[in-house]
Amino acid sequence: MIGTRGVPARYGGFETAIEEVGRRLADRGHRVLVYSRNPDADTPLPRLYRGMRVVELPAMRRRSLETLSHTGASIVHLLRRVHPDVAFVFNAANSPFLPALRAARIPVATHVDGLEWKRGKWGPAGQRYYRAAEAAAVRLSDALIADAQGIADYYAQEFSAPTELISYGAPQVPTRTDRLAELSLEAGGYHLVVARFEIENHVDVVVDGYTRSSARRPLVVVGSAPYADEYTRRVESLADARVRLLGGVWDQELLDQLYTGALVYHHGHSVGGTNPSLLR
């Protein structure tokens, strides 16, 4: 599995999908290899995680190059040392590397992600790149995977390309809320938004709308993102004393309890496929 931050899942939907799908494949006896990036250089990633072999490789710490540089390193490692039965590539933006896999006669399934060219963080050049990468993914993949019907419809209409629609799921979790006290919260006593701090997820809009309201219960905001300092400052500037900015919460049990105990969940995502935070 190539093209994301990998496992353990500590970032977004792709990483959650890899963890959930990868561990199930491993449980069925498949040998699963996940290429991963490490957000904490001082703490090495585990070499084996939930039955999956983890290969930690470096990446250029620049928004426009981080994914591509890591995917390129992953492809080189894969071709030299692994040569798998199949490669599962995440994100159509990684399609420039698909010819190398095809030349090695490795079947490729590409999870196309959402309509990345619509994201405001990319300028005209980035948007053109994403559109071209989508077309390349259609030509060079043995199979295309979409996680939402809208994405499948887009590829059918834009490229006359069939996709395998594999919708995300969400686990049924116990309805415990005992750990909310760690955050000085009570079940039913707060509003919640969980999102990566991207413009299209509209965390700032949610916070702005909340602070303009007469709501008495606090708004708990869970989320962060690399390269999002300016956007984070905007969210912080809109918040008042009723807004609790927790940053990223990677303790899954605690996060599940936050979902369970929320009076209202606010979801502002406007680009992409199915979002795991909404399903939960």
Whereabouts are the PLM-identified features?
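Acidic donor-binding loop of glycosyltransferase active sites
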Residues: 257-273
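Nucleotide-activated donor-binding/catalytic signature segment of Leloir-type glycosyltransferases, i.e.
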Residues: 232-253
